[in-house]
Amino acid sequence: MGRFAAALVGSLFWLGLLLCGLGSLASAEPRAPPNRIAIVGAGIGGTSSAYYLRKKFGKDVKIDVFEREEVGGRLATLKVQGHDYEAGGSVIHPLNLHMKRFVKELGLSSVPASGGLVGVYNGKSLVFEESSWFVINVIKLVWRYGFQSLRMHMWVEDLLDKFMRIYRYQSHDYAFSSVEKLMHAIGGDDYVRLLNQTLRENLKKAGFSETFLNEMIAPVMKVNYGQSTDINAFVGAVSLTAADSNLWAVEGGNKIVCSGLLQASSSNLISGSVMSIEEKTRTKQTGNPTKMYEVVYKTGSETHSDFYDIVLVAAPLNRKMSNITFRNFDPPIEEFNDPYQQLVTTFIKGELNSTLFSSRPKDQFGLSAILVTDDSDMFINSLSIVASVRQKEGPPPAVDGMHVWKTFSRDILTKEQISKLFLSYDYAVRKPWLSYPHYEPPQKCPSIILHDRLYYLNGIEFAASCMEMSAIAGYNAALLAYHRWNGNEDMIDQDDLYERLKTEL
């Protein structure tokens, strides 16, 4: 999704991020590891936590990963005429260090994100058209917006410079018991405050114009999160990090990272739906009673249950998505009613009706992606030419003027709407889903620790939802479970980490 933002503002946004190594480090003398760990959800959060739990607890613990659909979760592909296309999380930043590490350690290959020129449409005309010449783009941006793009770069760079501290903290095995404490350790009160104000409010206070917000910032939010500049300021900044010309994806589909992590962690995949989780007292072979979690799940028409020492929930607990019942907890596990945003991804092979966007003859229309402003009356969030997950060189040349186009929209496109977009088309294949949280500051992130040894990863999505954030959450949950199991309280919620670690190489 972030590919469009890259083409749009990459001319002036260069995001320098701090690189940190991800080595293994010594810790306190651990007690005997748990016998069994359950992970609910086989997306990037669940599979990355399995990967790191295996590294921390060793080879003897049994790890079961439950998935009711396909491994990969919202890193999904859609098969169109025999070719697979990214329908969910599509691109990866060159300095997303966890994803970069996974690809390297799993022996996978990367492909560059689809290229091409981008335009911004306001419902009447193109208010910005990217040129293939860098200098011309700079002139266009400065002429229309002054130096606001440069100022925007500086704002985002400052936020991300702090955010990249998380890699150093995690490389030293530090964990956090809440999303807010993680955010505070990264950037203090100012960082946490980003969750409690809208992106528009933040940028207006910083002096950015309505024109710049409407034409440059809002379209990026719309394509990346299907929402407006009223999202929280932190997820807005994350969205703008897609302004990089070196975005990439995993050859064969980003979801194969998840299956690779499952295999690397020697986890047992259980294809079924978790129905309930309940704490119960069990008697071990030694005769000592111990608290464990009974996980009840359904495979096909059969219901089963197993007991686990530790449970990690790596799937949204919104009732429309997971529908897991937490039985007999005292106090009760909190309810999760925060809404998720509906998104419809549609792949259409057709000849674009370029006159809808420009009066230029179609043979002179060179845009490969179109973003739309908030004030347009368009029924789509974006439109772009895409390549399949196995096409290393990008989208193939047009055949009879036809490309495979990918659209994002809030609702399913009607035949009339598709016919308005395309002069002719061969097919339209769609996938509707609840893709990411609906952001509405002030943002309260769900708890990570639901019970003594019951953890929830997806609360981090309410700060920002993307592949790398899920991988960070997976690593954090694994470290948190490990340290709490072994009583390493000095490795949790340490606020002075930046000062303590900044002098280390």
UniProtKB/Swiss-Prot annotation:
Gene Ontology MF annotations: FAD binding; farnesylcysteine lyase activity; prenylcysteine oxidase activity
InterPro entries documented for this protein: FAD/NAD-bd_sf, Prenylcys_lyase, Prenylcysteine_Oxase1
Annotated signal sequence range: 1-28
Domain of life assignment: Eukaryota
Tissue expression from the record: Highly expressed in the liver, kidney, heart and brain.
Main location: other
Entry-linked SUPFAM superfamilies: FAD/NAD(P)-binding domain
Record key words, sorted: FAD, Flavoprotein, Glycoprotein, Lysosome, Oxidoreductase, Signal
Name of this protein: Prenylcysteine oxidase 1
Gene: Pcyox1
